[in-house]
A protein has these predicted regions:
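Positively charged n-region of N-terminal signal peptides that target proteins for export
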Residues: 1-4
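Bacterial N-terminal signal peptides
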Residues: 7-17
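General helical structural elements
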Residues: 6-7, 185
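Terminal leader/tail segments of proteins
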Residues: 20-187
């Protein structure tokens, strides 16, 4: 009788695991969760994309936005997250100049100058990446923007204006690539 109960329990457990949804998105073999919880705020996946640079695969990305927020408000003061998984090694010191260039393309000069201390702090947090490493930026209103590498927090930069500027690199009016922005926004 015990054996029959064990078999029945095993069958129920196995049936339950096969019925569970996968809750993820995959692009180029890289898997991203369909949601993320940050400071008790649920962020939903809006889209995933592949960024090519000079014809080479640079990285894949996923963008998460606070549930209930409009996709047109991605740069507003709302919780959001971007994850980028790299296909190539990049030196930490090389992230700063690229970040400066892309922020400057998306904000006016007075705004860039006002944000310079936050941008410099952000750029100082970057470390070398190798293929398979994943950077994330998570913005929580009132808290700031956290940069993490492979899930390990590197630092927190305060300010909704900084968050809008740094997320504009991928989602602003002059992003890294329009096609990548559109993929991240599910368009």
């Amino acid at each position: 009788m015990k054996r029959l109960l064990l078999y029945a329990l095993f069958a129920v457990i196995m049936a339950g695991t096969h019925a569970l949804p996968t809750h993820s998105a995959e692009i180029e073999g890289v898997v991203y969760r369909d949601s993320y919880i940050a400071d008790n705020i649920k962020l939903r996946l809006t889209g995933v994309g592949l960024l090519r640079y000079w014809g080479f695969k640079a990285y894949t990305g996923a963008f998460y936005l606070e549930e209930g927020a409009a996709i047109d408000d991605v740069l507003s003061n709302t919780a959001k997250r971007i994850e980028l998984e790299y296909f190539r090694a990049i030196k930490g010191k090389d992230f700063g100049p690229a970040t400066n260039k892309m922020i400057a393309k998306n904000v006016d000069t007075p705004t860039f100058d006002r944000l310079r201390p936050q941008i410099n702090l952000h750029n100082s947090l970057y470390e070398d990446v190798k293929p398979g490493d994943r950077y994330s930026l998570t913005y929580i209103p009132g808290r700031g923007t956290e940069l993490a590498l492979n899930g390990e927090p590197k630092g927190l930069i305060k300010g909704a204006d900084f968050a809008a500027a740094v997320f504009a690199i991928w989602l602003g009016p002059n992003p890294m690539k329009d096609s990548f922005r559109n993929q991240l926004l599910g368009r």
